[in-house]
Swiss-Prot record:
Its EC number is 2.7.11.-, 2.7.4.-. Keywords: ATP-binding, Carbohydrate metabolism, Kinase, Magnesium, Metal-binding, Multifunctional enzyme, Nucleotide-binding, Serine/threonine-protein kinase, Transferase. Belongs to the HPrK/P family. NCBIfam families: hpr-ser. Homohexamer. Catalyzes the ATP- as well as the pyrophosphate-dependent phosphorylation of a specific serine residue in HPr, a phosphocarrier protein of the phosphoenolpyruvate-dependent sugar phosphotransferase system (PTS). HprK/P also catalyzes the pyrophosphate-producing, inorganic phosphate-dependent dephosphorylation (phosphorolysis) of seryl-phosphorylated HPr (P-Ser-HPr). The keyword Nucleus does not apply. It is an enzyme of class 2 (transferase). ATP binds at G151, E152, S153, G154, I155, G156, K157, S158. The active site is at H136, K157, D175 (proton acceptor), R240. Residues 198-207 are annotated as: Important for the catalytic mechanism of both phosphorylation and dephosphorylation. This is HPr kinase/phosphorylase.
Length: 307
């Protein structure tokens, strides 16, 4: 996703002191504090990052001789930077403003503390610049676990989600799920147009918040499990013990995948609830049900051998 300086001005409510180039793009979420550059160090300068000036940099410039400030500002603005943000509502040095206008560089100001500006800006840019993809499926929150239900078109994903919503769980997205990877974590959301809507074949589109209340939907959710629905295949050996873990890679992040075969009489909503509960159990307990059975069998064998 392309992010420009104009975007952060609007979204982060920044004051414009000097207007720079139109549609100036920000390509990284990393931030630079240019104190070393103001001291004359340019062996390494991350000029492609947003430059944030706080109290330390401001005080350093303030106590510098006028002629030296002029030289340092001239050198600093020879490098192309996306923008400069001055925190704490500080008054910029006249030489900074003069050189910014000369080189058409954005200079912005925030009333927030420097650490708040840096944190807010990095979180914003991380979210906006994160790798993203769109997948076909339904994302629901079941017992606090993000379940991405996938499968062929018409397999019953939306109908299963509707049953889960009826049972008190929450819908995040239906049909199309927008997924972003931030620090190795996958977060799913709904496209704006279909947000809160669920399509059920034979009925059409259902407004979930209108029918089940605002608590029945979520704006975004971390994806913990992928449930793949498929028609029962008699010639396939399905995992009956849960020993073999299967994973689906989304944006280079492996997500545990469960394949659930469909045939008459199977209650998919109950199965998905059990999968979510079992996942939570696995997070809290180190011993899996399979290991418990193995331990019981070993104990039984030992007891038999003692007789």
């Amino acid at each position: 996703m392309k992010i420009t300086v104009e975007d952060i001005i609007k979204d982060l409510e920044l004051e414009v002191l000097v207007q720079g180039e139109k549609d100036k793009e920000i390509k990284t979420s990393d931030i630079n504090r240019p104190g070393l550059q103001f001291a004359g160090f340019y062996s390494y300068f991350a000029n492609s990052r947003v430059q944030v000036i706080g109290n330390a940099e401001w005080s350093f410039l303030k106590n510098m001789p006028v002629e030296l400030i002029r030289k340092r500002m001239k050198k600093f603005f020879e490098f192309d930077t996306p923008c400069i943000i001055i925190a704490r509502d500080l008054e910029p040095h006249p030489q900074l403003i003069k050189n910014a206008k000369l080189h058409k560089r954005w200079v912005l100001r925030s009333k927030l503390l420097t650490t708040k500006v840096v944190t807010k800006l990095m979180n914003y840019l991380d979210a906006k610049l994160a790798p993203e993809t769109r997948m076909h499926g339904v994302l629901v929150d079941v017992y606090g676990i993000g379940m991405l239900i996938t499968g062929e078109s018409g397999i019953g994903k939306s109908e299963t989600a509707l049953e889960l919503i009826k049972r008190g769980h929450r819908l995040v997205a239906d049909d199309a799920v927008d997924i972003k990877e931030i620090d190795g974590v996958l977060r799913g959301t709904s496209p704006y147009i279909t947000s809160g809507m669920l399509e059920v074949r034979g009925m059409g589109i259902i407004d979930i918040p209108a029918l089940y209340g605002l608590s029945s939907v979520l704006q975004k959710k971390t994806i913990h499990l992928v449930i793949y629905l498929e028609q029962w295949k008699p010639d396939r050996n399905y995992d009956r013990l849960g020993i073999d873990d299967d994973f689906l890679e989304i944006l280079n992040v492996p997500v545990k995948k469960l394949t659930v075969p469909i045939r008459p009489g199977r209650n998919l909503a109950v199965i998905i609830e059990a999968a979510a509960a079992n996942y939570r159990y696995g997070l809290m307990c180190k011993v899996s049900p399979v290991e418990t059975i193995n331990n019981r069998m070993e104990s039984m064998v030992r007891n038999e051998s003692k007789r």
